[in-house]
Amino acid sequence: SSAASDVYKRQHVFRGNDHIFEEMEGLRFKVGPKSFYQTNSEQAYNLYKVARDFAGLTGDELVYDLYTGTGTIANFVSRQARKVIGIEYVPEAIEDAKVNAEINGIENTLFFAGDMKDILTQDFINQYGRPDVIITDPPRAGMHQDVVDVILFAEPKRIVYVSCNPATQARDLQLLDVKYRVKAVQPVDMFPHTHHVENVVLLELK
C-alpha cells in the first residue's frame, strides 16, 4: 500500500548509528535498514562458504552475482575471482555494496541497481562479458522468465543457485534443465526449529 511505502521511505535515527557491521573472514559488511542481510550471521557464513565452494573459482573467472543485496556474496568470493558483477533491485543496498567493497579494499567488483530483468539483458552480457559462473540468490518468488532466458543465453559453465524457497527453485531448475544438469545439492539450516531452509544447488553446463 502507499501508506506502507511512505513509512518505508521515512527514516529517523533516535540514537546510535543508522547501520551495523557484520564480519566474515576478515571482511566487514555494512548493513543498513533497507538492505537485505541474512538474519542468522553464523549460518550465513556457512551458506556463503557452500556457495563459494560450489562456484569452484580459480582466480580467472568473471562471476555474476544476481540479487546481490549488500554485495555480501560478491565481495566474499572476489578474492577467488578475476571480476565480480553484482546486480540488485534496492538502490540503498547497492550503495552499501559499493561501500563494503571500498572498506575492504576490494577493487574487482562492479555493482548495478535496478530491476533484474531490465538490467540483465543480452546487450548487458555482450557489453560486460559472458560470465564463467553465475551465483543467484533470488527472493522467494524465484527468477523471472526473462532472467532465466538471459542466463541460458549467457551459458556460464556453472550456476550456483541459492534459494529460500525450494518450490520456486525447483520450478527454475526445470527451466534451466534444457542446458544444465544438477551436480550437487546442499541445504543449510538458517532458521533452526522452523520448516524454513536455504538450499544451494550447483548446476553445470551439459
Model-derived features: where do they sit?
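Rossmann-like S-adenosyl-L-methionine
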Residues: 5-206
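Blade-terminus and WD-like Trp-Asp/Gly-His loop motifs, strongest in beta-propeller folds
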Residues: 1-2
